[in-house]
Amino acid sequence: MRNLESIKEILARDSRLIRLPAQGKAVFIGDTHGDFDATEKVFRLYFKPGYTLVFLGDYVDRGKHSRKNIEFLLKKKLEAPKQIFLLMGNHEGYSVLPFSPADFWERLSLEENKFFSEICEFLSFAAITENGLIAVHGVPPDVNELGEIDDIQSGSEHWQQVTWGDLVEMPGNFLGYYGGRPIYGEDYFKRKMNQLRCKVLIRAHQPYIETVTFKKHCLTLMTSHAYKPLRYIAIADLEKPAIKTVDELEILEI
């Protein structure tokens, strides 16, 4: 890996809101959580011309190869900054909102902790496509328009939504906290998706929610054996005029 400033410079070129190109295909990868085999397989299959890779956060903790996983992703981001995009998950926000267990962070020296914390602060919060997709780690933030995502500050309520937010298929907006995680219901989901003019949400974060929810307008991906025996990714055709439901995505086990 290059020095800290080189990595920060590359990540800083991306805004908090990534606007994906309208060409080729996008591969969305859920929590990898130290499952380096999953990350390596994604690159072996899809790191090629015509494909953009969007990782949805949570690269560390839980799995056996957290450091190897995040260092590999950062190295690849340096090699192909316009082909690989790294979103922030709650496990990358440890320095902002600590949690436990956090085996990756707790094993680092003070110097190493500072190094990775500074890098993770530059990760993006969301990605959108021209044909109706929005991707975040948790839930879409309660902003009035997409451009406001660029102004979200770490530690804010909006930041907690995109990194820590849970969804449940029941009526309601904000439904309170469970285990420190803010929970949002069906009314919030519908309101935000309509307000942001997006048709399908692709997210990660919740390993035990159904993969497809909200009448096929929400897809939750887990791409790690840390939680489940099966690992999934999703591929979107960025050249389609519109993507209106999850059915129009290619969901694959890796």
Regions found by a protein language model. Give the residues of each.
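Active-site-proximal loop/helix segment associated with metal-binding centers of metalloenzymes
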Residues: 2-5, 9, 102, 111-112, ...
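Active-site environment of divalent metal-dependent phosphoester hydrolases
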Residues: 33-37, 61-64, 91-97, 141-143, ...
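N-terminal active-site segment of His-dependent metallophosphoesterases
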Residues: 1-72
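Active-site neighborhood of divalent metal-dependent phosphoester bond hydrolases
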Residues: 51-52, 62-152, 157
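Active-site neighborhood of phospho(di)ester-bond hydrolases with catalytic His/Asp-centered motifs
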Residues: 28-30, 53-57, 85-90, 135-136, ...
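MPN/JAMM (Mov34/JAB) isopeptidase/deubiquitinase module and associated MPN-bearing subunits/adaptors
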Residues: 242-254
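Conserved beta-sheet core of the metallophosphoesterase superfamily
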Residues: 78, 108-111, 179-241
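Beta-strand-turn-beta hairpins that frame and shape the catalytic cleft
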Residues: 20-27, 128-134, 215-217
